Amino acid sequence: MAPKAKIVLVGSGMIGGVMATLIVQKNLGDVVMFDIVKNMPHGKALDTSHTNVMAYSNCKVSGSNTYDDLKDADVVIVTAGFTKAPGKSDKEWNRDDLLPLNNKIMIEIGGHIKNNCPNAFIIVVTNPVDVMVQLLHQHSGVPKNKIVGLGGVLDTSRLKYYISQKLNVCPRDVNAHIVGAHGNKMVLLKRYITVGGIPLQEFINNKKITDQELDAIFDRTINTALEIVNLHASPYVAPAAAIIEMAESYIRDLRKVLICSTLLEGQYGHKDIFAGTPLVIGGNGVEQVIELQLNADEKKKFDEAVAETSRMKALI
């Protein structure tokens, strides 16, 4: 990697805007904000570049409407894609409708990555992410350790926050794992939740939280995106922060353990499919895939999550 990382945001919408700001605040590298909307990324880049002063940073932020600016990127973050089916009302479409539309975008982006930055570390955000990350992996030809999908970092941040609020503790003191898939099939692992290193079961035993309250928190975690949308907003700040945590671990070789969608090669009994599991992300990309020991019920839910990803992939 060059002394200063080149980070290209493919998609400069709401998530892209927050990501660019966080990159400057952390002084992670130079940013290219790419989008197909003419001039828009240039305006956002100009605005964001001014925050260098307040952040005591020195990051170049530029806008682009051409894929040529992917050239020699160190990190590529892909948020581009449809979030709903065009021409259909909210009641007329479902996530399956996005598959052919976003697959075309992955084909296009993958070709440009292959030609311009085949050694970059790729983070895929486009939904359904566990399918799209596999498609972009195929279309770009990047090594399996150089591409991951957003999922568990965001999902667990929500779960950790809700638990911390119930127990009145610092959110960072809650540790939790969500594996399998990003979406309704995510697998929340109650057995692995700790608070300050103490198993959550101790807090249940001491009546600080009940199983029913925990189940409600699980349900809220799964449905958080819908909750935000129903409040006439859009989830983009926390997703952006989760993505930048992943990128920073790669750029700065932090070797953080982060839950992301990665290519399974026998873990959990599955091969040639992307799914969420803890990873060590460092300067070489995915440096270790951590397979958690699941009980029968957890394994059944994990298998169902993978089956849903396989079903969607088969529709393309």
UniProtKB/Swiss-Prot annotation:
Recorded coiled-coil stretches: none
Keyword Transmembrane helix: no
Any Pfam family: Ldh_1_C
Listed transmembrane segments: none
Keywords: NAD, Oxidoreductase, Pyruvate
Matches recorded under InterPro entries: L-lactate/malate_DH, Lactate/malate_DH_C, Lactate/malate_DH_N, Lactate_DH/Glyco_Ohase_4_C, Malate_DH_type3, NAD(P)-bd_dom_sf
Metabolic or biological pathway, per its Swiss-Prot or TrEMBL entry: Fermentation; pyruvate fermentation to lactate; (S)-lactate from pyruvate: step 1/1
One record GO biological process: glycolytic process
Catalytic residue positions: 182
Catalytic activity reported: (S)-lactate + NAD(+) = pyruvate + NADH + H(+)
Gene Ontology molecular-function annotations: L-lactate dehydrogenase activity; NAD binding; oxidoreductase activity
Top-level EC class: oxidoreductase
NCBIfam families cross-referenced by the UniProt entry: PRK06223.1 (NF004863)
Family, per entry: Belongs to the LDH/MDH superfamily. LDH family.
Subunit architecture: Homotetramer.
Protein name: L-lactate dehydrogenase
Organism: Plasmodium berghei (strain Anka)
